[in-house]
Amino acid sequence: APALLCALFACGMQIAANFINDLYDYLKGSDRADRLGPERACAQGWITPTAMKRGIAGMLIFSCLIGCTLLQQCWGQLPHGGWGLILLGLLCVIFAFLYTTLLSYKGWGDLLVLVFFGFIPVGGTYYVQAHSITADVWVASFICGLVIDTLLVVNNYRDREQDALSGKRTLIVRFGEPFGRYLY
């Protein structure tokens, strides 16, 4: 059951982060008409910013309820109770906002993907089941984070010109197209 709860928490947080990204890129004007990639709900007028904020709140509440259920199941079995899980959950919520509102525009996207799609979900899921972390788990977490980061890299490569115009300083915008090909 802890692994399923971890998966539900991760899915809920991913949906919340996608909603936050859609809303704040729209509010910042990053989702222009010449944008490549999938259409965005706020930019297309399919959903109002107010409704998107409600969706964000709903997904965060859902994720926090899942997190509380996980804590209830694991509390007392983990070293230090479950305080580490509380900290990880809070970091997930905080960085879901910071990623789009600030950090992705400053070139921190790749590092954050490595942490929040590698170390936290893989290491966290292992930890709540085994009650410890091993070097193998750190390696597996790192590899999973790198695999997921290739999706960000390919999107940033595709969007490099629009990102530059929007003020997004991704690694590919900073270091150029040849670097992007190498990074991928």
Residue spans for each PLM region:
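Membrane-embedded alpha-helical segments that form the functional core of polytopic membrane enzymes
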Residues: 1-23, 84-97, 134-154
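Phosphate-binding glycine-rich loops and adjacent basic patches that engage nucleotide phosphates
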Residues: 3, 18-32, 77-88, 101-105, ...
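Solvent-exposed interhelical
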Residues: 20-61, 145-184
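Transmembrane helix-loop junctions in multipass membrane proteins, especially transporters and channels
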Residues: 22, 26-30, 72-79, 101-105, ...
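Intramembrane alpha-helical segments
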Residues: 38-132
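Functional transmembrane core segments of multi-pass inner-membrane proteins
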Residues: 113-160, 166, 179
